């Protein structure tokens, strides 16, 4: 463990989970629940505020650099409720100047003028879940919106003065061709987003797609989709700063950057996770709230509302740091590792040199980052830092699944 005098609190973000959606998509493994009978909006907002008050002693005196309202479908909540949540957060935890406040939105839930109302409530950034502009693929993915509604949502964001918005897109979809994947990218670029997230569809456990797998494009086709879309985005002025994230004009997602840099985050809401550093003790804590919304509504703000609290073991800190930081194109320095993990750089130096000998990582101006080969086999590179796992002599020839 490093001396505490050498350490400073990592940046802190707030995640607010709003778990309800109109319809559970067959690929979604998030803690989301289709609305049955009505949205308990006021009751849930009150539970969130109790939850936040309970967690304050863990982060008192710190400032928030970002807030992210995720789900579920946060755009189901009225702007007045979003304003209430954000106002309470500001009173409890000061926000830094220019703090990023993101709200996730489903194009199928947006009425005219709604984004302007969210902006008035304090939202500074939107993340719009488009996934595809192809009618067949939207149906296969179980999305409730049409391609035109996705276009309308982006235009509404511009009209509201929320030009800093992200579009989520997926590729490697059932029955998708390379040209269709490129059409999705071109359609997204035409809407002038500041940010674009481009994820490969994966079949996650506890989803309908996992139980009844659809036929997906083969690995070679999916790889070509990724490379071709990547080339189009870069040509159009999008800078790839993370495996699946692209930004124009420096408008990276500050909230996700804090995750990927192994910063701290406080999570409130059903199933929300937190990662918090206790530098005086040289500890990193993880805690999460009960998952079921009905149980959360009953127990938020009490000891019963916390599902578990655990200490992150030193070996797990190493893996978690590398799992996240290796996704970023900015690389990391030895000091970045020490400040984020409270551990000496010597704990990873040998493993990095071994990976360097295999052309998986490189060191440039004092910063480590994957090589092109390392990014292509990122899962294998990350696995070299798993606790108590003997590392393979050479990488396995399997492209990384980008998600």
Predicted feature descriptions by range:
Residues 4-13, 32-58, 62-343, 394-403:
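C-terminal scaffold of the Radical SAM
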Residues 14-18:
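Short active-site neighborhood of thiol/selenol oxidoreductases, capturing the structured segment around
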Residues 19-32:
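Local cysteine-cluster metal-coordination motifs and their immediate loop/turn environment
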Residues 168, 316-323, 349, 372-375, ...:
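Non-catalytic, well-ordered alpha-helical scaffold segments
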Residues 342-354:
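Short amphipathic alpha-helical interaction segments
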Residues 367-371:
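Minor-groove-contacting beta-hairpin "wing" of winged helix-turn-helix DNA-binding domains
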Residues 375-403:
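Short, amphipathic alpha-helical interaction segments positioned at domain boundaries
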